[in-house]
Amino acid sequence: MNFKYIVAVSFLIASAYARSVQNDEQSLSQRDVLEEEESLREIRGIGGKILSGLKTALKGAAKELASTYLHRKRTAEEHEVMKRLEAVMRDLDSLDYPEEASERETRGFNQDEIANLFTKKEKRILGPVLGLVGSALGGLIKKIG
């Protein structure tokens, strides 16, 4: 009977030791995971700071280019460059605020569409008016001359 108790107690001690070893391994692996997550957060933080610095530099460069082209007439090529810069600026802003950027793009599209509509209406109205004014001036010049 003593032998059964000795075997049972030794079995309990062995299982308790196995559990403690297993718990130690789990806690070590959890620490490793936590350390890896912390280092990844640090790397992401550094990467985020670098990206924000690059975005700030790009925005500054784009604003400088815009201000140099703003006060003089632009060629078609310069106009295309400015359009591309504006698109880059929108893309950079969309990285910071994706929801607001999509709203701005939609709002910008609607404004462009409305502007095109008004331009078409102006052409339809101004065309005949200018024709009438031109013919009236032509008639006056013929009468005077």
Swiss-Prot record:
Propiece residues: 19-43, 75-122
Organs and tissues of expression: Expressed by the skin glands.
Organism taxonomic ancestry: Eukaryota, Metazoa, Chordata, Craniata, Vertebrata
Modified-residue entries (Isoleucine amide), positions: 144
One biological process term in Gene Ontology: defense response to bacterium
Keywords: Amidation, Amphibian defense peptide, Antibiotic, Antimicrobial, Cleavage on pair of basic residues, Cytolysis, Fungicide, Hemolysis, Secreted, Signal
Protein name (database record): Maximins 3/H11 type 3
InterPro entries xrefs: Bombinin
Compartments reported by the entry: Secreted
Family: Belongs to the bombinin family.
Function: Maximin-3 shows antibacterial activity against both Gram-positive and Gram-negative bacteria. It also shows antimicrobial activity against the fungus C.albicans, but not against A.flavus nor P.uticale. It has little hemolytic activity. It possess a significant cytotoxicity against tumor cell lines. It possess a significant anti-HIV activity. It shows high spermicidal activity.
Keyword Secreted: yes
Disulfide cysteine pairs (residue numbers): none
